[in-house]
């Protein structure tokens, strides 16, 4: 199979270029820091709607919110979320 050139730079040329490492030495750490801030500030809980670790169990509801019967799951979920 003799394939032609796609006109793209070889990967080895890209990762050995100085420009690649200048760009990525800034972007990779900044992505890490922004992800850490997203989680550590609690914004991830607000964006995705998940409860914070201290909100899983309230004073009124100390049992595990578990659905037991798949055919009456809607009613069980309504009962579990009634006090929220």
From Swiss-Prot:
Q: What is its subcellular localisation? A: Plastid, Chloroplast thylakoid membrane
Which GO cellular component terms, listed alphabetically, does the Swiss-Prot or TrEMBL entry include?
A: chloroplast thylakoid membrane; photosystem II reaction center
Positions of transmembrane segments: 22-36
Q: What biological processes does GO assign it?
A: photosynthetic electron transport chain
Query: What is written in the cofactor note of this entry?
Result: With its partner (PsbF) binds heme. PSII binds additional chlorophylls, carotenoids and specific lipids.
Does the UniProt entry include the keyword Membrane?
A: yes
Q: How does it sit in the membrane?
A: Single-pass membrane protein
Classification via InterPro entries = PSII_cyt_b559_asu, PSII_cyt_b559_asu_sf, PSII_cyt_b559_CS, PSII_cyt_b559_N, PSII_cytb559_asu_lum
Cofactor(s) for this UniProt protein? heme b
Q: Which UniProt keywords apply?
A: Chloroplast, Electron transport, Heme, Iron, Membrane, Metal-binding, Photosynthesis, Photosystem II, Plastid, Thylakoid, Transmembrane, Transmembrane helix, Transport
Assembly and interactions? Answer: Heterodimer of an alpha subunit and a beta subunit. PSII is composed of 1 copy each of membrane proteins PsbA, PsbB, PsbC, PsbD, PsbE, PsbF, PsbH, PsbI, PsbJ, PsbK, PsbL, PsbM, PsbT, PsbX, PsbY, PsbZ, Psb30/Ycf12, at least 3 peripheral proteins of the oxygen-evolving complex and a large number of cofactors. It forms dimeric complexes.
Q: Which family does it belong to?
A: Belongs to the PsbE/PsbF family.
- Family annotation (HAMAP family): PSII_PsbE
* Function (record text): This b-type cytochrome is tightly associated with the reaction center of photosystem II (PSII). PSII is a light-driven water:plastoquinone oxidoreductase that uses light energy to abstract electrons from H(2)O, generating O(2) and a proton gradient subsequently used for ATP formation. It consists of a core antenna complex that captures photons, and an electron transfer chain that converts photonic excitation into a charge separation.
**What is the protein name given in its UniProt record?**
Cytochrome b559 subunit alpha
Task: Give the taxonomic lineage as stored in the record.
Answer: Eukaryota, Sar, Stramenopiles, Ochrophyta, Bacillariophyta
